[in-house]
């Protein structure tokens, strides 16, 4: 009950291999439970070594080690953050980059607690200092772009990229880090990095991720955005698309600009929103499945051509290389030296795979931005701070409920500008297309290649995001803008086919939550407009019986709500007595047995809807002994709210539960009159 924020997902993080194979292998074989912390102790000790190359390899080994969750407690015990922090300002640029890579992985793999601990251990001081040094270095660096490209080793831009990723991860998990970001003037620095998007899109993408994080719910930072800063974002937003990575950059910048909507002048709002949704429409209009197929074929052909060329070269020059010992020695030395550079420690990523991942990530991000556009701000905790889950709050709740005409929270709404742009750019149609299962040929290609296999999960995630988007749009747009009643019935059939085409749908929790959310919104809209529903009661009961056993609270809330919507429609029809009895018994069982108050409250709401009116509903309520069951449960529900509510549920959830408690009292009184009338 209540809106939940869309989740954000990080990109795959830095994972070193290469010249530091010994350290990496030791890290991979180590366990966090050893008394001496295994490889952790040795690697941390090497961070103090006089040799820069040893320090670099130790950092790379730690970057690999922190990806193993059992190793994290040992690293925390040995104060890894305080030991790595100073290396961000090491005299060696190579050490700086690998130290930042290790901290990047630590912040990504450790989660909220580790990131908060990193802030406590003052990682932000050397991190901000390194950001500023990189900025100054970029200003003073007069090498030509071609020289920089050829050098491609331990460059300032590479260090800046790793540093921004650490900053992004920490700010995503720690409000204290965001506060430091604000106070230390980091915005100006990262915007300078963003300005390099024409020549370094990787750095610009990292900055855009970071900006999208720090601009969310951060009014203090919004004051720091000057006209120059906004112009920089605009130039990145409107830049030509030269690759899928540049398209991802534009999408992330669009998300940042949406976060800044409160400081955009009113006269420019429509133009800006139009520009944002034009880009999101372009991203969603691309066929990701076809892209996967084309890029995989291109990679196969490129590797085949390269292998043939290498074989010809070996056949031509093999004898000369064997005979020329001196040249062989030089060649060997070069190969060994080349492996010590940090860029060789990064996992090799083929250009086709990078392009494909960029498109999939852009589409996922675009869908998440649209969901955010469709959501009201979360209710403030302060708004309900004085409410308590006690009987004394009932009078206040009843007055508030009456004043709002029976609606506790304001409904979701779209601004005219967003509404117009969504429909003009055919966003609903494109989102509908994304709800289909991923291209089977693309999935098959990816499943047969280890480096491409993770893309299957990304394609499935896009489908789930599209279903959540569909939920928002169905709730917000007029039926006419969704294509009319016939289109909604077609959509219901489509969702039904998606759901029941998978016999084991209950095992796919993310998919089940997304599709049940979309179905809930769709059935609610159809019921409110008296549009006949296409799913049979038996199909809905199959969904609900599977969903109610899910560990995901959102799934359980959705299925009981779906039953409530369906039951309220059936209650007005003749010949539905047995179905209503089944629905009532199911909802009563959920009400009394589900461990979550949120689910129990939703089930009570559903009971109120189903048995509020109609002759068949009245007969069913008597036969399942609804009144006595609710009377018995009422004191239990009050007690559970009082004992379990505080600390386990948010203030807006508690407010809704108080509302359900009040309605339960009303509903029992109503059922008493029904029972008297029918039994007298």
UniProtKB/Swiss-Prot annotation:
UniProt-listed GO biological process terms: erythrocyte maturation; protein import into nucleus; ribosomal large subunit biogenesis
Q: Coiled coil: which residue ranges?
A: none
Q: Which CDD domains match?
A: Syo1_like
| One Gene Ontology MF term | unfolded protein binding
Q: Does the keyword Endoplasmic reticulum apply?
A: no
Q: Which residues carry this modification: Phosphoserine?
A: 15, 144
Q: Enumerate composition-biased segments (Low complexity).
A: 18-29
Mutagenesis / variant outcome for changing residue 446 to Y: In DBA21; severe decrease of protein levels in patient cells; results in impaired biogenesis of 60S ribosomal subunits
Compositional bias, Basic residues, is annotated for 1-11
**Which effect does the record note for changing residue 240 to L?**
In DBA21; uncertain significance
By its UniProt entry, which InterPro entries does this protein fall under?
Answer: ARM-like, ARM-type_fold, Nuclear_Import_Ribosome_Adapt
Q: Which residues carry this modification: Phosphothreonine?
A: 340
Could you tell me which residues belong to the region Disordered?
1-39
Q: Which domain of life is it from?
A: Eukaryota
Question: How the protein is affected by changing residue 584 to E?
Answer: In DBA21; severe decrease of protein levels in patient cells; bone marrow patient cells show abnormal acceleration of erythrocyte maturation suggesting impaired function; affects function in RPL5 nuclear import as shown in patient cells
Described purpose of this protein according to its UniProt entry: Plays a role in ribosome biogenesis and in nuclear import of the 60S ribosomal protein L5/large ribosomal subunit protein uL18 (RPL5). Required for proper erythrocyte maturation.
Query: Which PANTHER family does this UniProt record tie to the protein?
Result: HEAT REPEAT-CONTAINING PROTEIN 3
Family from the record: Belongs to the nuclear import and ribosome assembly adapter family.
Subunit (UniProt): Component of a hexameric 5S RNP precursor complex, composed of 5S RNA, RRS1, RPF2/BXDC1, RPL5, RPL11 and HEATR3; this complex acts as a precursor for ribosome assembly.
Supply the name of the protein: HEAT repeat-containing protein 3
- Source organism (scientific name): Homo sapiens
What phylogenetic lineage does the species belong to? Eukaryota, Metazoa, Chordata, Craniata, Vertebrata
């Amino acid at each position: 009950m209540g809106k939940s924020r869309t989740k954000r997902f990080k990109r795959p993080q830095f994972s070193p291999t290469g010249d530091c194979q010994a350290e990496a292998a030791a890290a991979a074989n180590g366990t966090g439970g050893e008394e001496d912390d295994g490889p952790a102790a040795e690697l941390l000790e090497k961070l103090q070594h006089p040799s820069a190359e040893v320090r670099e390899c130790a950092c790379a080994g730690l970057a690999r080690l922190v990806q193993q969750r059992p190793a994290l407690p040992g690293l925390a015990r040995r104060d890894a953050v305080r030991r790595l922090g100073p290396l961000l300002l090491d005299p060696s640029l190579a050490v700086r980059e690998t130290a930042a890579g290790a901290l990047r992985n630590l912040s990504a793999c450790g989660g909220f607690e580790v990131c908060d601990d990193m802030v406590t251990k003052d990682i932000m001081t050397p991190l901000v200092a390194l950001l500023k040094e990189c900025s100054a270095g970029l200003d003073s660096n007069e090498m030509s772009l071609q020289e920089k490209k050829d050098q491609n080793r331990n460059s300032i831009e590479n260090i800046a990229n790793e540093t921004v990723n650490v900053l992004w991860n920490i700010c995503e998990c720690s409000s204290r880090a965001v506060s430091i970001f604000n106070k230390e003037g980091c915005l100006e620095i990262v915007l300078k990095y963003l300005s390099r998007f024409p020549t370094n899109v990787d750095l610009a993408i990292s900055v855009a991720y970071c900006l999208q994080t720090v601009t969310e719910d951060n009014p203090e930072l919004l004051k720091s955005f000057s006209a120059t800063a906004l112009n920089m974002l605009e130039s990145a937003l409107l830049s030509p698309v030269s690759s899928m990575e540049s398209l991802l950059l534009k999408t992330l910048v669009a998300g940042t600009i949406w976060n800044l909507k409160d400081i955009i002048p009113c006269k420019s709002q429509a133009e800006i929103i139009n520009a944002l949704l034009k880009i999101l429409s372009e991203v969603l209009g691309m066929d990701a499945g076809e892209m996967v197929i084309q890029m995989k074929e291109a990679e196969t052909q490129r590797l085949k051509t390269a292998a043939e060329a290498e074989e010809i070269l070996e056949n031509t020059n093999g004898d000369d290389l064997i005979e020329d010992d001196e040249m062989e020695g030089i060649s060997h030395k070069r190969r060994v030296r080349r492996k010590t550079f940090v860029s060789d420690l990064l996992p090799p990523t083929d250009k086709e795979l990078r392009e494909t991942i960029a498109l999939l990530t852009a589409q996922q991000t675009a869908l998440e931005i649209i969901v955010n556009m469709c959501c009201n701000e979360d209710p403030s905790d302060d708004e309900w701070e004085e409410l308590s889950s006690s009987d004394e709050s009932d009078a206040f709740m009843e007055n508030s409920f009456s004043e709002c005409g029976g609606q506790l929270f304001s409904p979701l709404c779209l601004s005219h500008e967003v509404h117009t742009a969504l429909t003009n750019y055919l966003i609903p149609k494109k989102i509908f297309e994304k709800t289909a299962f991923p291209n089977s040929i693309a999935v098959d290609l990816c499943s047969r290649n280890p480096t491409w296999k993770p893309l299957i999960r990304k394609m499935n995630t896009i489908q789930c995001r599209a279903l959540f988007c569909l939920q928002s749009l169905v709730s917000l747009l007029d039926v006419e803008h969704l294509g009319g009643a016939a289109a909604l019935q077609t959509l219901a059939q489509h969702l039904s086919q998606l759901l029941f085409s998978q016999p084991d749908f209950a095992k796919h929790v993310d998919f089940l939550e997304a599709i049940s959310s979309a179905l809930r919104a769709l059935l609610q809209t159809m019921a409110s407009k008296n549009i006949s529903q296409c799913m049979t009661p038996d199909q809905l009961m199959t969904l609900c019986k599977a969903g109610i056993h899910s560990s995901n609270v959102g799934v359980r809330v959705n299925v009981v709500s779906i039953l409530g919507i369906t039951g309220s429609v059936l209650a007005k029809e003749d010949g539905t007595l047995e179905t209503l009895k089944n629905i009532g018994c199911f909802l009563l069982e959920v009400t009394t047995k589900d461990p979550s108050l949120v689910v129990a409250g939703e089930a009570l709401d559903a009971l109120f809807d189903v048995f509020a009116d109609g002759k068949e509903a009245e007969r069913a309520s008597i036969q399942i002994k609804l009144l006595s069951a609710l009377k018995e449960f009422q004191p239990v529900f009050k007690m559970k709210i009082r004992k379990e509510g505080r600390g386990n549920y948010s203030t807006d959830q508690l407010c809704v539960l108080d509302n359900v408690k009040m309605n339960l009292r009303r509903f029992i009184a109503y059922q008493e009159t029904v029972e008297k009338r029918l039994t007298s």
